[in-house]
Amino acid sequence: MIDLKFLRDNPDVVRASQITRGEDPALVDELISADESRREAIKAADDLRAEQKAFGKKIGQASPEDRPALLEGSNELKAKVKDAEAAQEAAEAKVNELQMKLSNVVSGAPAGGEDDFVVLETIGEPRTFDFEPKDHLELGESLGLIDMKRGTKVSGARFYYLTGDGAMLQLGMLMLAAQKAREAGFSMMIPPVLVRPEIMAGTGFLGDHSEEIYYLERDDMYLVGTSEVALAGYHKDEIIDLNEGPVKYAGWSSCFRREAGSYGKDTRGILRVHQFDKVEMFVYCKPEDAEDVHQQLLGMEKEMLAAIEVPYRVIDVAGGDLGASAARKFDTEAWVPTQDTYRELTSTSNCTTFQARRLQTRYRDENGKPQIAATLNGTLATTRWLVAILENNQQADGSVVVPEALRPFVGKDVLKPVKQAG
């Protein structure tokens, strides 16, 4: 959530952010009004409590004959205090409700929607094939890497098995990401994939896109779509030490997404699935360091994409395509030959203090005063990278050259077609 003081001091900035996102700017004025009512309710309750305290002293000093009347007045005042505290509680609940609806303030992102991104950099040239390239699923099946048929049989649409060298290719990619993260000072974690509602809400995922999340009603738990959620909750209600610099974690987990709003999109292969694996970077830092950290995360993503040897571009995502918690987001998109377009492989978001304020994660400034931390996240490797690896590294004979950085994990330089059983 955003800082109420910032909102009061900069209402036009927040209204403009809402407009950039394609969201309702009237929510800003509604929250400002609710905040004014809350502050009035707090003052009214404080004044009555002060009056009640003074009245109590008066009773203690009263004569026996005056005390009964004063006690009657005290009871009336007690009832007023109770009503005022109830009004304060209701006013605070209303402010919290509206704060939870308001997205983070966009910072530097271009205006517009999904198609209004700005290309910041293009790295590598799309390959020109002297044969008709196969898509990743055809390659995956012929090489014995992907089994969609049995995945669908066992679990339904958008499920799959990674088999043989396909499993090793993914494990190698994730291990390489973990190694690079450790070398860069990240602490590795394998976090829970089930989280409580307050953690999911704290990261900003229970807004307009909550239908994308798997919910276990019987247990009142959510399956995460990214380890960002559990890593953000790790320091909930804590004061962390940032004196030596940012606190950096890399979470390796399975991720789950309902893909409720994507009916008919990317139904072939493993680009858009219900379950996948990912190594996610997550950083806590001082707010003034957040923009530099954001560039560092993007740099690590670019280093990984260079290692898997695919052409890609970096885009600055438009405000209308940002998630609720992100003030700015950079995506990298790899070239997918059979689709003749770029597709997202990584995202890195600067969430400023939005998540940490909800989760009450703080640090102490140079004066020892607790302040809200900033949080950032970024993808370092994930299952859909296999799409780009297979398609961009395929050969005319149907084989796929394994990127050099992944060969120690896969144990092969080239993946060759195999005869499929069943």
From Swiss-Prot:
Keywords: Aminoacyl-tRNA synthetase, ATP-binding, Cytoplasm, Ligase, Nucleotide-binding, Protein biosynthesis
InterPro entries: aa-tRNA-synt_IIb, aa-tRNA-synth_II, aa-tRNA-synth_II/BPL/LPL, Ser-tRNA-ligase_type_1, Ser-tRNA-synth_1_N, SerRS_1_N_sf, SerRS_core, tRNA-bd_arm
Binding-site residues, ATP: R257, R258, E259, V273, E344, L345, T346, S347
Localization annotation: Cytoplasm
GO CC aspect terms: cytoplasm
Amino acids binding L-serine: T226, S227, E228, E280, T379
Entry keyword Protein biosynthesis: yes
Primary localisation category: cytoplasm
EC number(s) per entry: 6.1.1.11
GO molecular function: ATP binding; serine-tRNA ligase activity
Pathway: Aminoacyl-tRNA biosynthesis; selenocysteinyl-tRNA(Sec) biosynthesis; L-seryl-tRNA(Sec) from L-serine and tRNA(Sec): step 1/1
BP terms from Gene Ontology: selenocysteine biosynthetic process; seryl-tRNA aminoacylation
SUPFAM superfamilies per the UniProt record, alphabetical: Class II aaRS and biotin synthetases, tRNA-binding arm
The reaction(s) this protein catalyses: tRNA(Ser) + L-serine + ATP = L-seryl-tRNA(Ser) + AMP + diphosphate + H(+); tRNA(Sec) + L-serine + ATP = L-seryl-tRNA(Sec) + AMP + diphosphate + H(+)
Domain notes: Consists of two distinct domains, a catalytic core and a N-terminal extension that is involved in tRNA binding.
Protein function: Catalyzes the attachment of serine to tRNA(Ser). Is also able to aminoacylate tRNA(Sec) with serine, to form the misacylated tRNA L-seryl-tRNA(Sec), which will be further converted into selenocysteinyl-tRNA(Sec).
Subunit text: Homodimer. The tRNA molecule binds across the dimer.
Family statement drawn from the similarity comment of this UniProt entry: Belongs to the class-II aminoacyl-tRNA synthetase family. Type-1 seryl-tRNA synthetase subfamily.
HAMAP family in the record: Ser_tRNA_synth_type1
Protein name in UniProt: Serine--tRNA ligase
Protein's gene: serS
